[in-house]
């Protein structure tokens, strides 16, 4: 990733946009379309670096996949005819690819090695290895916690498992492995997490029963899978940057169309509503994932907020940009119970506080979150994404609060989830 980018966006931001397809759903659609025998088309997918890593892995397993500008076309021989790859399956910077594909590979009966970049090499994998081994998977890693992961054929058993962390990636690793289990599997959630794996299993004809915090899978659920086409909604995590930009920039009025508003992911909407920001949802649809158009307007008198409990996993990827939003509230905001942020691409608690404090804002990192005081952009300094796409985009939005350009090191990390992020912001600047 190259070094510094000088970022300057001029408000007000006015106009109507769409954001790239949802990253979580694109990953899962590629995986499920590849497992099914036949043709599946994914419309409006996210073509960021993470999702393209998932594409490359299934190509190496013998699936024909064609990536176009606005769709991914899959023609698969089916999971029974996957071939053994004769090279390491490289997941890049993608935690989703690493953890979900690991769960899937455990049941496939293929010997494989999964490895990612330096950042992935620091992220904990024991959280998936423990339940997968409980299912009789043969999976090992460095110090039983880090990539590369070595996966060997094993007969997968169904389990009853109580989640120890609120992590959709861990839950999904278990669910993908359970497709190959000889007995039913039951998972009890620790806290509600994004449910895209469950909704997309249903879309690809795999039976799954969800009752409050209990998820049940039948034995050998993989045998039910059928190919399917899927239209990917816009990613609410990407929309969040434009939502906050509109709320904090005088004179702004932004509408984002076709955004996924799955209730397990829509914490950002609840946060803005509680802060009394000017936000409206319309054009709502619900098949198979709920979507809406979201309009935001400049909101100078927002209230502070306490974020904890089940609101945290529902907004986990948005906490850095929410922290910036909270600096513009008229009182002190608190984020608690967000320890999960410590094991993302960076320690997002510390990185968010450190980078914003460099610019004159006032944030205090805590063991499990942040204390955010009303504060302003007071001085330009060279900041750094530390190769974390969400930190890079948050800092670009922070530049709206300054009259000067902001130098952001390692800014092209944003390409992981939002290629074309800056041009999209500039589009609203031009229309304004």
From Swiss-Prot:
Residues forming the catalytic site: 317 (proton acceptor)
Binding positions (3-phosphoshikimate): 23-24, 28, 167, 169, 317, 344
Cellular localisation: Cytoplasm
Subcellular location, principal: cytoplasm
Keywords: Amino-acid biosynthesis, Aromatic amino acid biosynthesis, Cytoplasm, Transferase
GO annotation, biological process: amino acid biosynthetic process; aromatic amino acid family biosynthetic process; chorismate biosynthetic process
PROSITE patterns: EPSP_SYNTHASE_1, EPSP_SYNTHASE_2
SUPFAM superfamilies in the record: EPT/RTPC-like (SSF55205)
Entry's transmembrane regions: none
Name used for this protein in its record: 3-phosphoshikimate 1-carboxyvinyltransferase
Species: Staphylococcus saprophyticus subsp. saprophyticus (strain ATCC 15305 / DSM 20229 / NCIMB 8711 / NCTC 7292 / S-41)
Encoding gene, per UniProt annotation: aroA
